[in-house]
Amino acid sequence: EEDEDFIRQQTLKLLYILAGFFSLSLENAYLFEDLKRSYFDTIRAVANSVEARDPYTRGHSARVADISKVVAAELGWSKRDIELIDWGGILHDLGKVGIHDAILNKPGKLTDEEFEIMKSHPLIGSQIIEGISFLEPVTPFILEHHERFDGRGYPRGLKGTGISKEGRILAVADSFDAMTTDRPYRKALAARTAMDELLRVAGTQLDPEMVTAFEKAWRTGKIK
C-alpha cells in the first residue's frame, strides 16, 4: 500500500513537472508541434495506466471519446470542436491517477467518505492540464463531466447551460459506457436498456438536447 501511494504521488509530481516544462518551451515555435504531441501522448498514457489498474474500465476513456465525437458531429459541430471533445473524452478520468486503488476498485458501494474522495478526480484532472495552452480549452470539460443538468452534480453543482456543452456530452457518453460494460457489482446492460435509462434521466441528470442527439446517432447505428 505504501508503494502504491508513493507511485501515485510520483506520477502526479511528474505530470506537474512536465506541465511546467511544456509551458516554458512554447517560446520555441519549431518545437511546439512535437512537444504538443509528446505531452499529449504522455498524459494519455497516464490516463490509460489508471484504467489498466481496473480491468472493468479498460478502454473506457477511448470509448467515451469516440461516442462524444459522434454526438458532436450529429449536432453539426466544427472539426476543431470535435477534436477538442475527443481530447476531453480521452482525458476526462485523468484525475483518477490521484485516487487510491482501494477506492477505485472497490467491488461494493463506496462509503460517504470514499465517495467524497472519488468526487475529487475531476478537479485533480483539470489541475494537471491547467496552464497548458493547447489543452486549456479542455480543462472545463474534464472538470464538469460529473455535473448534472439539474444542478445536483459535482464538483461545483453547475446547472443547465451553466455546464459547458462538452461537459454535457461527456456526461451522456460516460453514463452510456458505464452502463453497457461489466462492473464488479453487475453485468453490462443491453444497449437498449441503457438507452431507455438515458431517456429516463434526460432533464434531470442529463441534458435532453444531448440525449436526443445521442439517441439519433444510436438509432442510425453510429453508436453501438
For each of these PLM feature ranges, what is it?
Residues 1, 24, 181:
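Sensory beta-strand/linker motifs that couple input domains to effectors
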Residues 2-3, 176:
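PAS/PAC or PAS-like capping segment
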Residues 3-4, 184:
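Surface-exposed, flexible loop/turn segments at secondary-structure boundaries
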Residues 5-27, 83, 165:
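Amphipathic alpha-helical "output/dimerization" segments
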Residues 9, 33, 40, 44-224:
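Metal-dependent catalytic cores of enzymes that make or break cyclic nucleotides
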